[in-house]
Amino acid sequence: MFRGASAINLDTKGRIAIPVRYREPLQLEHQGRIVITVDIQSACLLLYPIHEWELIEAKLLKLSDTDKTQRSLKRLLLGYAHEVELDGNGRILLPPPLRQYANLDKRIMLVGQLNKFELWDEQAWLQQIDECQETIRSEELANNERLADFSL
């Protein structure tokens, strides 16, 4: 399970170093293989360990190619999907189209989301945090059926 936000750098060759604490689980459980694709709701990338991605692919396989919305979803997620492997230094290469989609430059954030990571431009991440906090403050959590009994 991946959790926490890590500030990392994108090097001039388009590579990022995965934080050390995540490397061993990625190597042992997923042979260092990761699939990167776009987030269809935010300007960030999603990084799935290979076995998690295979679950997503199984769901995508069941979607219709004749339904416009389903086909569009498949086209974006699969069209941008790129499999990478951790190198000996724990780095992965982010292909240019993916870097462009998420407006990634030098300073980026790798954010654990339990079964996957999000990869954000640092400034976009800070803005996203502000938006999330505003949403939570503006919503009546008790009226949200899935959050009504959620407590910390």
Swiss-Prot record:
SUPFAM superfamilies: AbrB/MazE/MraZ-like (SSF89447). Keywords: Cytoplasm, DNA-binding, Repeat, Transcription, Transcription regulation. PROSITE patterns: SPOVT_ABRB (PS51740). It comes from the Bacteria. Residues 5-52, 81-124 form the SpoVT-AbrB domain. CDD domains: MraZ_C, MraZ_N. GO terms for cellular component: cytoplasm; nucleoid. It holds the Pfam family MraZ. InterPro entries: MraZ, MraZ_C, MraZ_dom, MraZ_N, MraZ_sf, SpoVT-AbrB_dom, SpoVT-AbrB_sf. It is found in: Cytoplasm, Nucleoid. One of its GO terms (biological process) is negative regulation of DNA-templated transcription initiation. GO terms for molecular function: DNA-binding transcription factor activity; transcription cis-regulatory region binding. Its main location: cytoplasm. Belongs to the MraZ family. HAMAP family: MraZ. Forms oligomers. NCBIfam families: division/cell wall cluster transcriptional repressor MraZ. This is Transcriptional regulator MraZ. It comes from Shewanella sp. (strain W3-18-1). The gene is mraZ.
